[in-house]
Amino acid sequence: MLISHSDLNQQLKSAGIGFNATELHGFLSGLLCGGLKDQSWLPLLYQFSNDNHAYPTGLVQPVTELYEKISQTLSDVEGFTFELGLTEDENVFAQADSLSDWANQFLLGLGLAQPKLAKEKGEIGEAVDDLQDICQLGYDEDDNEEELAEALEEIIEYVRTIAMLFYSHFNEEEIESKPVLH
């Protein structure tokens, strides 16, 4: 069974890792959406979240399971089952912060997997620009929470769609080689 968001957060914090569960999910999603297919994801994760040090043994398995789950949901292009690993906190302001954290780390992972990402044009280039804007997502504590929650829901759906767009674009050969089952 996949570790819960809060349990993963606790384990990361206890181990002194520089990512929370949301940031970890965003980073791993970015690597996968960028087309990374080999085992280099683990050294990259260590490099960017733990000063090049391996994670404690007890943390490697749940992180690997999360990576595999993200990979599985991303590859289900037809089912669109991919979800952003955002905070379980119901507070709309915490959700907005979580989305911003996720998007920041997603872009980092995506950029590592696709070093020429900044040169992308068209739909992909626009999606990168949109994600950069989402990273800067701001709100005022006086904002209407209901309106913010509605806007946030739309942005989250848009980010899910963008992630699938990147995955489809940078993993084209893999998607095309999968047999269509009827």
Curated annotation (Swiss-Prot):
InterPro entries: YgfB-like (IPR011978), YgfB-like_sf (IPR036255). One of its GO terms (cellular component) is cytosol. It comes from the Bacteria. It holds the Pfam family UPF0149. Belongs to the UPF0149 family. This is UPF0149 protein CGSHiGG_07585.
